[in-house]
Regions:
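Nucleotidyltransferase catalytic core that binds NTPs
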Residues: 1-188
């Protein structure tokens, strides 16, 4: 089984995240996609609880898109992959990353181990993905997703404009907006 691994804070989950997840599954780039929300190991400000982020993500769970917070306590991506390989024996893993991540991929802890995985890289801006792959010595085992419309959304921008109903409606699904309002999340 080919399992895609999509790791992030998802603070909050927005239409861009879901568009990516659906694209990967609908185009059969993987058999199953695991969305793994992380703890706040990097000192991000205004991050809500893991449970609230999981609750918002669960609204998007399907038979092929699985929200898995079992490994959220692990700090590094390579640790998550190691744990997943024990849970899903005999599976192949693909790591989903944005092109902005490939620029500094060699700074990731144990990035050499992650390079052994298939990388599914989402084109962003004008980043020359092939240049960075060559620099990393990754000549095969990757997919560059360039036919997905560029997604100019960031969770930070959404949080910074949490009072602007038009921005919320543009970038978040109604269920997520309702959850944020009900729980009074991201309020200053």
């Amino acid at each position: 089984m080919r399992i895609g691994v999509f790791v992030g804070s998802f603070n909050p989950v927005h239409k861009g995240h879901i568009k990516i997840a659906n694209y990967i599954v609908d185009n059969n780039l993987v058999d199953k996609l695991l969305i793994i929300p992380t703890q706040n190991y990097w000192g991000k400000t205004n991050i809500i609880s893991l449970q609230d982020r999981v609750n918002m993500l669960k609204k998007y769970e399907t038979s092929r898109i699985i929200i898995d917070s079992d490994f959220s306590d692990l700090k590094y991506t390579y640790q998550i992959i190691d744990a997943l390989s024990k849970k899903y024996k005999n599976s192949e893993f693909s790591l989903i990353i944005g092109a902005d991540n490939i620029v500094n991929f060699d700074k990731w802890v144990h990035y050499e181990d992650l390079l052994k995985l298939e990388l599914i890289i989402l084109k962003r801006n004008d980043i020359d993905i092939n240049y960075y792959l060559k620099k990393l010595g990754k000549n095969e085992g990757y997919i560059i997703v360039s036919d997905l419309d560029e997604i100019d959304i960031s969770s930070t921008m959404i949080r910074n404009n949490i009072e602007d109903e038009s921005i919320l409606k543009q970038y978040l699904d109604d269920e997520v907006i309702d959850y944020i309002k009900e729980k009074k999340l991201y309020r200053k």
